[in-house]
Each structure stands twice: as C-alpha cells, then as structure tokens.
C-alpha cells in the first residue's frame, strides 16, 4: 500500500514497520519490511526483508498485478506455552496474533482490487536460530502452513525451517521472489532485531483483546 509521505501518522508507521530506499543498480525503489510490518503495492518496486525465526508470506494477484509481504512472529509468554502450542488452537493468543498478521496483508490486497480466489502465496523463514527460542521457528512454520490450508490459499513455493536465516526480495506485480542465505557474520544483528520484536510482543499480547480476529 502506498502511503502519503505528507501524513505524519503514516510517516511514523513507515519508520516503525518498513523503510524505503532507492536501489541504483536495479533502478527501483525497495521497501524493507521490518518485524511486525506489512507492505502492499501495485507499483514497480521491490519488497525485501531479512528473516531468522520470523516468517513472511508473499502474496499476489497475478491478474490485478498487486502484491505484498508481511513479517511476523508468534508471541509466546513462556517456553511451556511455546512447546505445547499447536496450530489448531485457533483461540490461543499466538494463533489470534498470527491470523491478525495474515488478515492485515490479505485485507490490504483486497482493498487494492485483488480477488481472493486469484491469490497466490510464497512462504519463507522459520529458521531454528541457536540461542533464540529453540522451537519458535518451527511453530511459526506450523502456523503459516496450517493457516494457508484452512483458508484455501494456494502455496506455489516455500522455503521454510532449517538453520540458516534468509534475505528475501519480492516483486509484488509478478510474484517473482529471490532468496539468499544470510552469512554467519550478519546473524547476530538479525537475532537482536527479532529479539526486540519478540520482547515488544510479550508486552502487547498481555491483553488479548487488543488483537481482533477477522
């Protein structure tokens, strides 16, 4: 979704959840989606993100030529809750937050004229990063695959799980995606970014009423 740069509320949203820069080599604007963010576009630009334990859904309508990406992590209050959670627990706080992250992306696509029956999806992320919530990547993968199946969304490609973080680049008009494994030297920065996001979620999800299930 293209946001009005004059509107200060949207400026604050951009600073918090995504950043925009011009890639001279490709001659295109690129939008980096940060943890907790959603970005949708019908413009000639590329959407990118870095993923450790988080997951991203890249969804597009090939007829309308509109697409978008989210970047999220399921919130768990403790290791016991994380270990025993399953994707069919639809009313749990983690499932409701995950559904909210997916519906935010879907609703913004539909608002730009996409048709739900035409939507295609590619899924990335969910790595098991050492020293960071040992099962969180696995649970994120379980959730997003279960959600796609339950909602009847066509998953045409995915690269999920494993041990290596990823960099993703996505063309919202064509659905083409590029994946690159993140070198070990960059892992600590990504881990810190996701840990800050997870800590923020722990505070926000103490009151589940703040998350609406569509």
Swiss-Prot record:
A GO BP annotation: chemotaxis
PANTHER family according to UniProt: CHEMORECEPTOR GLUTAMINE DEAMIDASE CHED-RELATED
Tagged with keyword Hydrolase: yes
Protein purpose: Probably deamidates glutamine residues to glutamate on methyl-accepting chemotaxis receptors (MCPs), playing an important role in chemotaxis.
Name of the protein: Probable chemoreceptor glutamine deamidase CheD
EC number(s) recorded for this UniProt protein: 3.5.1.44
GO MF entry, a single one: protein-glutamine glutaminase activity
CDD domains: CheD
Domain of life per record: Bacteria
Similarity comment text for this entry: Belongs to the CheD family.
Pfam family of the protein (one): CheD
Sorted UniProt keywords: Chemotaxis, Hydrolase
Catalytic activity entry: L-glutaminyl-[protein] + H2O = L-glutamyl-[protein] + NH4(+)
Source organism of the structure: Vibrio vulnificus (strain CMCP6)
């Amino acid at each position: 979704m293209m946001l009005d740069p004059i509107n200060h509320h949207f400026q604050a949203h951009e600073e918090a959840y995504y950043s925009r820069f011009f890639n001279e080599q490709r001659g295109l604007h690129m939008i980096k989606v940060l943890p907790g963010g959603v970005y949708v576009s019908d413009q000639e630009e590329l959407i990118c993100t870095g993923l450790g334990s988080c997951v991203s859904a890249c969804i597009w309508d090939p007829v309308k030529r509109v697409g978008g990406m989210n970047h999220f992590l399921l919130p768990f209050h403790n290791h016991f809750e994380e270990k025993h959670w399953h994707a069919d627990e639809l009313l749990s706080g983690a499932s409701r937050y995950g559904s909210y992250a997916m519906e935010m992306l879907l609703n913004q696509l539909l608002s730009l004229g996409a048709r739900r029956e035409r939507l295609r999806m590619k899924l990335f992320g969910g790595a098991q990063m050492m020293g960071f919530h040992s099962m969180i990547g696995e649970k994120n993968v379980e959730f997003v695959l279960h959600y796609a199946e339950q909602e009847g969304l066509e998953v045409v490609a995915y690269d999920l799980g494993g041990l290596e973080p990823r960099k993703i680049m996505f063309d919202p008009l064509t659905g083409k995606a590029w994946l690159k494994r993140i070198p070990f030297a960059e892992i600590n920065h990504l881990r810190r970014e996701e840990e800050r996001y997870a800590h923020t979620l722990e505070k926000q999800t103490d009151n589940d009423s703040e998350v609406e299930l569509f």
